[in-house]
Amino acid sequence: MALKSFNPTTPSQRQLVIVDRAGLYKGKPVKTLTEGLSSKGGRNNLGRITVRFQGGGHKRTYRLVDFKRRKFDVEGTVERLEYDPNRTAFIALVNYADGEQAYILAPQRLAAGDKVIASDKAVDVKPGNTMPLQFIPVGSIIHNVEMKPGKGGQIARSAGTYAQLVGRDQGMAILRLNSGEQRLVHGSCLASIGAVSNPDHGNINDGKAGRSRWRGKRPHVRGVVMNPVDHPHGGGEGRTSGGRHPVTPWGKPTKGKRTRSNKSTDKFIMRSRHQRKK
């Protein structure tokens, strides 16, 4: 899908660049594959703000997307591609041979009428097909990769993302991720072939603040323009630079400070995403 720009009738129209979604289905989603989604506004069950700068936005219906792909050896036909307001990628409605329907993440070059299949054995290497990493040819571009067998895909699910299978070692698959990280994943974990749809998502320009508000994003206020009671960078006469290394509102270092603390999975990371930056 291409990018779409508009005649400069207003300042926001002049700057607006969006993804042309003319090829997507224009109707409502399948009702049995949807759930209600209540707006949280960044609040928890106590009503306290736990995530700042969220709230408002258009009402959404949640689409139940099948990230597990455990319906083995039943061929499915793609009925249509749809927009999903809950993610940056597009989704595909699949009609299986046994009459069941499901939404899956749509990879690039998947179109209505295409056949897809998931299996615990080797199947054709074509977009949308799913199989264990141990059967996928080295060098393949993949997405929706499981980190634990049966848990469902967790890696490479966002628009335009993918991982590359670069090798195998003692029952483990070696993946290169978008971030530059090289990681070991068990060979029995499932992955889908292809890169995720909507690669132009990274090139859009909202054109105006209102388009962020429609998504439920509120203005992100900088610490240096707050009062001292609200932020460590706050206060001062006139404009100040904050006067210290950048910190969060709670005084923790930010802007590049590494926060990863899961030591138990360090052994699965062959190459850190930070190594290439040094």
UniProtKB/Swiss-Prot annotation:
Keywords: Ribonucleoprotein, Ribosomal protein, RNA-binding, rRNA-binding
UniProt keyword Zinc, yes or no: no
Keyword rRNA-binding: yes
Disordered: annotated span: 201-278
PROSITE patterns: RIBOSOMAL_L2
GO biological process, alphabetically ordered: cytoplasmic translation
Gene3D superfamilies, alphabetized: 2.30.30.30, Nucleic acid-binding proteins (2.40.50.140), Ribosomal protein L2, domain 3 (4.10.950.10)
Biased composition (Basic residues): 210-221
SMART domains: Ribosomal_L2, Ribosomal_L2_C
Function as written in the Swiss-Prot or TrEMBL entry: One of the primary rRNA binding proteins. Required for association of the 30S and 50S subunits to form the 70S ribosome, for tRNA binding and peptide bond formation. It has been suggested to have peptidyltransferase activity; this is somewhat controversial. Makes several contacts with the 16S rRNA in the 70S ribosome.
Complexes and interactors: Part of the 50S ribosomal subunit. Forms a bridge to the 30S subunit in the 70S ribosome.
Record protein name field: Large ribosomal subunit protein uL2
